[in-house]
Amino acid sequence: MEVIRYPNSPFKLHQPFPPAGDQPTAIAGLLEGLSDGLAYQTLLGVTGSGKTYTMANVIAQSGRPAIIMAHNKTLAAQLYAEMREFFPENAVEYFVSYYDYYQPEAYVPSRDLFIEKDSAINEHIEQMRLSATKNLMTRDDVIIVATVSAIYGIGDPTEYQQMVLSVKEGDTIEQRDIIATLVSMQYERGDLDFKRGSFRVRGDVIDVYPAESSENALRISLFDDEIDRLDMFDPLSGSLHQRVGRYTVFPSSHYVTPRDTVLRACESIKEELRERIEFFAREQRPVEQQRIEQRTRFDLEMLYEMGFCKGIENYSRHFSGKKEGEPPPTLMDYLPDNAIMFIDESHVTVTQIGGMYKGDASRKQNLVDYGFRLPSARDNRPLKFHEFEKVMPQTVFVSATPAKYEEEHAGQVVEQVVRPTGLVDPQIIIRPVATQVDDLMSEINDRIQKGERVLVTTLTKRMAEQLTDYYSELGIKVRYLHSDIDTVERVEIIRDLRLGLFDVLVGINLLREGLDIPEVSLVAILDADKEGFLRSHRSLIQTIGRAARNVNGVAILYADKITDSMKAAVDETERRREKQIKFNEEHGIVPQQIKKQVKDIIDGVYHEEDSGKGRRQGKNKVKVGEIHNEEDAIKEIAKLEKAMQQAARDLQFEEAAVLRDRIRNIKENLLFGAE
């Protein structure tokens, strides 16, 4: 693999092959648009044309920090993994919601039912979020892969940066001052339980486990009131990794604020509370008056004593000092001025960003109206779409089917229709609806004999269920993918399809963006002539594209009439086919079937870096169980960490070290943020 470093760029691109097909033209076009100052561009890239690789080349050549937005965690994880492969020496970060489970605070007036906020925070994703903001503030070579979590409020970047602890060998500082600063940054003192976001004191030595670090801790050795040396070490084994001259410890939460800001916020909250009490008194609503006073005074007491309280995010406007209705600080405020934004699958992601605010606002309004929260809680919210537009840096929309918004805003459209592999868009066949079920049956049998897979998309849940039952009774190995299936199980089903555990997958609207299944040679669209969201020309092109990764790809549209959407989808697919066929003929390319390994089962070996210290685990192969995506990995890591800590308490240090290496192994293989 060639490693390429462009002039004036901090990125090192690990290039498995040079750009080919339409990629060189697309890369040059996007770079020219960026240098010309175009605010918006569109990369119209067909399925399998290597859009992610094009993005990586644009980032590497421009030398600018980048944020890539995806519309769900699964796609974000896929992009994150690919970017880690292209930029293993740079800071590729993952910024998604850190909740494994989240029940927001809500009130149902009709039943007089108040639902307390309940959530389970995923520690590993929280660490990755903190790592993302730290690297945005300290490095130039940063690529953030994010979901819409990026438009939700987090702490103010200015306040966050003021709360850091910077230490340097030779500095004069008292031990008690270091401890006081760490406590103000919400680090816990844990002399017995040394974990992420904590510190311990042993004589003149302070060990700090930074909140954003996945596996390194900092040892501050003092001599009187002078910092004698700084070392990075393994928090489990205690083995030293390297000596550092200086280090910056960042706060353990995005919501940490200086003491004077907390006191200022408390005064502002008191003033708003007084106004709200007067309002409910005038309205003669004593229950709401007592409720808001009791709840807010309790929170104020916690803020005075501890510096934070449960639900502190509802007071974010008072902490940031913003006026009513002003946008909250978000990840977008942490981005440097020269950043680039890529919005992947923009025809879905842009719409999703636009819809986040309204759902949040209606829930908050009830809490305010009935005295559970102060009116300022409404400003703890995601960005409105027009606010998001104001903070968007130079943006590239990436989609095979750009929507109306992209078409209206694109300064230029760069096409990436030709695939380097030579694969041609699927041949489209239109057949009558009357015999669709039996006709499809014979097509399925043909594919099964060739060892290929089939995707079938229907219009309704009932139709999908009946079709699945019918084919199952006829001996076809068929599964049904529907909206009730969670992300983990969905990934498992797709993996099983690729492995050949079944041959046909039936779905409704789940067989579109982000499904990378080279084994699928037939996509069947039932009732293709029923105009609507599921049969719009964009939906049809996306669904047809699922067969574009197979050399024998065919799409059958069952319809009794040709609708405008069908005509647009067929014409666009034919245009792309002709362009690819012409390219193949000119360059003597014979389309080759993509042979993509099913990577979901990890069986790897962890090799500790050659540092002269520690031991090499190369000969001790560690087999990891079936891990399909980030959720599986996180569960496995949590289980292994519990076992590792128990082994350490039982003084079984060798066993603990093996478990530690398993955890690292999972992180490295799934590219989860091992540093």
Curated annotation (Swiss-Prot):
Any one GO molecular function term: excinuclease ABC activity
GO cellular component: cytoplasm; excinuclease repair complex
Top-rank taxon: Bacteria
Pfam family of the protein (one): UvrB_inter
Keyword flag Nucleotide-binding: yes
Keywords annotated in UniProt: ATP-binding, Cytoplasm, DNA damage, DNA excision, DNA repair, Excision nuclease, Nucleotide-binding, SOS response
Record's signal peptide: none
Residues annotated to bind ATP: G45, V46, T47, G48, S49, G50, K51, T52
Domain Helicase ATP-binding: 32-417
Compartments reported by the entry: Cytoplasm
Notes on the domains: The beta-hairpin motif is involved in DNA binding.
UniProt-listed HAMAP family: UvrB (MF_00204)
Self-association and partners: Forms a heterotetramer with UvrA during the search for lesions. Interacts with UvrC in an incision complex.
Family: Belongs to the UvrB family.
Biological role: The UvrABC repair system catalyzes the recognition and processing of DNA lesions. A damage recognition complex composed of 2 UvrA and 2 UvrB subunits scans DNA for abnormalities. Upon binding of the UvrA(2)B(2) complex to a putative damaged site, the DNA wraps around one UvrB monomer. DNA wrap is dependent on ATP binding by UvrB and probably causes local melting of the DNA helix, facilitating insertion of UvrB beta-hairpin between the DNA strands. Then UvrB probes one DNA strand for the presence of a lesion.
Protein name: UvrABC system protein B
Organism: Neisseria gonorrhoeae
